[in-house]
C-alpha cells in the first residue's frame, strides 16, 4: 500500500514493529500443517486487528504465488480506500516459509521500508475455504476466506478465533 511517510517515519515504524515483536512476552500459539497449495491464489481479508497500515482499507485481499525457491512466496496485499469501489492500494512483499517441509505454517514477509511481519496459520477450515493467521505474540490476527462469507459462516470464524485465545472484541470486519 502506498503511504506518505517520510524516511524517518518509515524507519521509526519499522523499529517499533521489530521491538514490539522481540520484547513481547507471550505463549507461542500452536500452528497447523498446511499444504503448499495454501500459498496459491487470492484470499479475502474478512476480519483483522486494526492497525495504522490498514486505516481506511476495505475489500482487502492477499494474493500468493510461488517465488524462485520452494520456500519463497511472492505476495501482493491490497485494498480499496474507504469503499469497495475506492482507489486500489497495494503493497508487494516476499515471504519465506520459516518451517518449510514440516508444517509450512510459519511465514515471514518482508515488505518495502524494512517492514517485516510474521504470519502463522493457526486454523484452516476442513473444506480449506478459510483460515486464521496471527503473529507469534497473538497481538495481530487475520481471518481470510476464498469468498465473502455469509453471516453465519463469519460467526463461526469469529468463534474459532475466540477458541484460539484471541480477544475477538478487538477485531474489525471491513466492508467487502
Regions picked out by a protein language model, each given a short descriptive name:
Residues 2-12:
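Bacterial N-terminal signal peptides that target proteins for export
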Residues 11-21:
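Bacterial N-terminal signal peptides
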Residues 22-176:
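A beta-rich soluble binding module of mature secreted/lumenal proteins
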Amino acid at each position: 500500500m502506498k503511504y506518505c511517510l517520510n524516511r524517518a517515519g518509515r524507519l521509526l515504524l519499522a523499529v517499533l514493529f521489530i521491538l514490539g515483536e522481540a520484547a513481547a512476552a507471550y505463549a507461542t500459539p500452536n500452528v497447523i500443517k498446511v499444504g503448499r497449495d495454501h500459498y496459491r491464489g487470492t484470499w479475502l481479508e474478512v476480519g483483522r486487528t486494526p492497525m495504522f497500515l490498514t486505516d481506511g482499507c476495505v475489500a482487502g485481499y492477499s494474493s500468493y504465488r510461488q517465488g524462485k525457491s520452494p520456500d519463497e512466496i511472492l505476495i501482493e496485499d491490497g485494498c480499496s480506500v474507504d469503499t469497495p469501489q475506492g482507489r486500489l492500494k497495494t503493497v508487494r512483499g516476499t515471504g519465506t516459509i520459516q518451517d518449510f517441509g514440516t508444517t509450512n505454517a510459519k511465514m515471514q514477509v518482508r515488505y518495502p521500508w524494512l517492514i517485516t511481519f510474521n504470519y502463522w496459520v493457526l486454523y484452516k477450515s476442513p473444506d480449506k475455504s478459510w483460515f486464521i493467521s496471527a503473529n507469534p505474540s497473538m497481538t495481530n490476527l487475520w481471518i481470510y476466506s476464498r469468498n465473502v462469507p455469509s453471516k453465519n459462516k463469519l460467526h463461526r470464524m469469529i468463534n474459532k478465533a475466540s477458541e484460539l485465545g484471541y480477544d475477538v472484541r478487538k477485531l474489525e470486519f471491513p466492508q467487502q
